[in-house]
Amino acid sequence: MGKVTGIAGRFGARYGSSVRKKWKEIMEKRYQDHQCPVCKTTGKVVRIASGVWYCKKCGAKWAGLAYTPY
């Protein structure tokens, strides 16, 4: 049975293990379900640009962090 590498598995043996682990943590935070600060709905928030987040339900748009909305 092989290792479970997750989202960073696409890099294979390249770039070093510590860089891949840090990148994996950041990307997992980015793609998890986030809650809208306006309508409090979870799972409808998407990133439309670096630091710009949008709620598909209520249409709210706000500036957040690069990989997380708050």
Curated annotation (Swiss-Prot):
Q: Name one GO molecular function term.
A: zinc ion binding
> Which cofactors are named for this entry?
Zn(2+)
Ligand binding (Zn(2+)): C36, C39, C55, C58
- Give the note describing cofactor binding and stoichiometry: Binds 1 zinc ion per subunit.
Q: Which GO terms describe its biological process?
A: translation
Q: Which UniProt keywords apply?
A: Metal-binding, Ribonucleoprotein, Ribosomal protein, RNA-binding, rRNA-binding, Zinc, Zinc-finger
GO cellular component terms, alphabetically, are: ribonucleoprotein complex; ribosome
Q: Which domain of life is it from?
A: Archaea
Q: Which cysteines are joined by disulfide bonds?
A: none
TM ranges are none
The record's annotation in InterPro entries points to:
Ribosomal_eL37/eL43, Ribosomal_eL43, Ribosomal_protein_eL43, Ribosomal_zn-bd
Q: Where are the zinc fingers (C4-type)?
A: 36-58
Pfam families documented for this protein: Ribosomal_L37ae
User: Sorted alphabetically, which HAMAP family does this protein's record hold?
Assistant: Ribosomal_eL43
Subunit (UniProt):
Part of the 50S ribosomal subunit.
Give the family, as the similarity comment puts it.
Belongs to the eukaryotic ribosomal protein eL43 family. Putative zinc-binding subfamily.
PANTHER family named among the record's database cross-references: 60S RIBOSOMAL PROTEIN L37A, LARGE RIBOSOMAL SUBUNIT PROTEIN EL43
Cited function: Binds to the 23S rRNA.
Name of the protein in its database record: Large ribosomal subunit protein eL43
- Lineage start: Archaea, Thermoproteota, Thermoprotei, Sulfolobales, Sulfolobaceae
Gene from which the chain derives: rpl37ae
